[in-house]
Amino acid sequence: MNPHTIRIPSDRFAFFTDEFQSKIFEIEKETSIHTTPTEIKVSAPDYLQLNNTLLKKSRTFNHRAKKLYNFITRWKKDFNDPTLTTSHLRTLTKRIKEELNKELYRFIPRKKFDESIRNEKYVLLTLHKQPEASIDVIGRYYEDQEANITNISRSLPDNWKLLIKEHTNAIGDRSIFFFTRLLRDPAIVLIDENESSLNIIENAQLVITVSGTVAYEAAMKGIPSATFADTFFNKLGLCKKLTLEDLRNSDIPELIEHIKESESKSHEFKNWILRNSFEGIISDPISNPKCITSHNIEKVSDAILTVGREIIPSARIQ
């Protein structure tokens, strides 16, 4: 049992019963802390906006100089930490590689989402930051993102495009060669990472991700979407789990028609997700300082007690 954000709305969380965060613990009894909103607004999660602010700061000269100073002096390092990288050279090599990738990324041709692309038939795929649990744990066996892109591209009709959008947090993680290999495929278009995913979703024929929120957003907006991993938002009729067998046996238009055959189920899903989630922010102080406010801690504590009573009804949980 682990608490985690439900992403939409971003100020609510649920308790998941599996390590893949695909199964939500369902509350049988109505509780006093279920002050649920009547409508769910699809918007970019708060944590993405916070991350983008931190990323912008991290690319300034002052921040890079401070990182270099901290690396040389190592005054922040706890040498009793068993997870600490012992090789100074290995750490330095990794950091130099990341900074080099960030600078070289500027030379990768990326397109704005303008009318020339908007009027095309396209599939949107958003990249994950890697390594990260969302793809290496939740998306196990589909963690090779380049292979996923190749497999999807092979299933596209000749006149369709595959739009690829980099995760802003991941800039510097992938080498320039990753992108140059992708761009050899004439069907692939690399979209500027600062473009709004919500705007791109609006005209997409299909949205695909390993386990990302973008598929959740698309399905809530009535756009067909698919995830390679099992997710709790596969309960939405317009968000299906995708496999290699699906790509092998059907082309993309056939997959879209299959997804559209399912009812949207958005109203039922909204009621279900709100009934089984709680107000509160599950995060860390760096990503979202609001998580350690007394008001939020009280909300999270109440939710934990509520779920505890649900699991062990006879227990005297105060």
Which functions belong to the PLM regions below?
Residues 5-9, 20, 128-132, 168-171, ...:
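Short, solvent-exposed loop/turn segments at secondary-structure junctions
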Residues 1-31:
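Active-site and donor-binding regions of nucleotide-sugar-utilizing enzymes
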Residues 116-117, 182, 199-203:
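Structural alpha-helical scaffold elements that stabilize or flank donor/cofactor-binding regions
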